[in-house]
Structures are given as structure tokens and as C-alpha cells.
């Protein structure tokens, strides 16, 4: 158990600094790190993460996702990541799913999904020319076609 705790402290050095703090007084990012660390202490075969970037500062998001990538490369466990930031999720995933209204409408290798023109336009903010769109230019869910007919 002590080795597991040291592993968590290695992954999240900030937690070691704050180890005597009450969890409720930790920042949002520190709370997310503590939640992931607590899960890792159980040595799971499947780590499920629901919106790990929600409400966090970009610097903390980067740190958490670097840790997710490192955990994935270790190969000790599978990771199921639910994330609304599609670009970030597809960057770290091997395989991806897109859901609409509770149904899987597209799945495949993450790089194939990220390369799909509809996904680029509707979820990643790219226009037909391949350039990033301004928020005002993005189509607000008025699609030419639906995923499911």
C-alpha cells in the first residue's frame, strides 16, 4: 500500500505537498488528482474517468491528461474516458466513440474519427477548408445529415 501511495505521489507531486490538507479545501484540480489517485490505489484493471477536465484550468488539464497518457502507456489497466472536449480526448485515445442522445453513432480508431470531415466540422471546430472556425461561424447543430437515418 505504501508503494501505491508513492506511485500516486510520483504521478501527482502536488498531492504530496498537500497530503495533510482536508480534501474539501483542495482546488478543483487537486481534487481531481486525489480522485484519480484514490482509484489507482485499488490497482484497477479498468479506470473510468468522467469529464476529468471539467472546470479546470488549462495547465491542470494538461497535467492530468499527461498522467492519463502515462498510465495508458504503462499498460497495467484499460482507461475509459468520457470527455466533452473531443479534440483532447481523441488526442490521447486509441479508440473512440461518439454518442448522440445516448446512442453510439460513430466508433473507430481515434485517428480515423479525428479525420472524419463531419466530426471535424461539428465537434472539432474545423470548416470545410480545414481551417479552424470562429465560434460565430460554427453550425449550431443544423446538420446536412444525421448520423442515424
What are these regions (language model features)?
Residues 22-26, 30:
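Conserved ABC ATPase signature
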Residues 26, 39-40:
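ABC ATPase signature
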Residues 62-76:
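Helical segment within the ABC ATPase nucleotide-binding domain
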Residues 95, 107:
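Short, glycine/charged-rich "phosphate-handling" switch motifs in NTP-dependent
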Residues 126-149:
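ABC ATPase nucleotide-binding domains
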Amino acid at each position: 500500500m505504501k508503494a501505491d501511495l508513492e506511485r500516486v505521489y510520483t504521478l501527482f507531486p502536488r498531492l504530496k505537498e498537500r497530503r495533510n490538507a482536508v480534501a474539501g479545501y483542495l482546488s478543483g484540480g487537486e481534487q481531481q488528482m486525489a480522485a484519480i489517485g484514490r482509484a489507482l490505489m485499488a490497482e484497477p484493471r479498468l479506470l473510468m474517468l468522467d469529464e476529468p477536465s471539467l472546470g479546470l484550468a488549462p495547465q491542470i488539464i494538461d497535467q492530468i491528461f499527461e498522467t492519463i497518457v502515462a498510465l495508458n502507456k504503462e499498460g497495467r489497466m484499460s482507461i475509459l474516458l468520457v470527455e466533452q472536449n473531443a479534440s483532447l480526448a481523441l488526442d490521447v485515445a486509441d479508440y473512440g466513440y461518439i454518442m448522440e442522445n445516448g446512442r453510439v453513432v460513430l466508433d473507430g480508431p481515434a485517428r480515423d474519427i479525428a479525420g472524419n470531415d463531419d466530426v471535424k466540422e461539428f465537434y472539432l471546430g474545423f470548416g470545410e477548408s480545414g481551417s479552424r472556425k470562429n465560434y460565430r461561424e460554427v453550425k449550431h447543430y443544423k446538420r446536412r445529415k444525421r448520423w442515424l437515418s
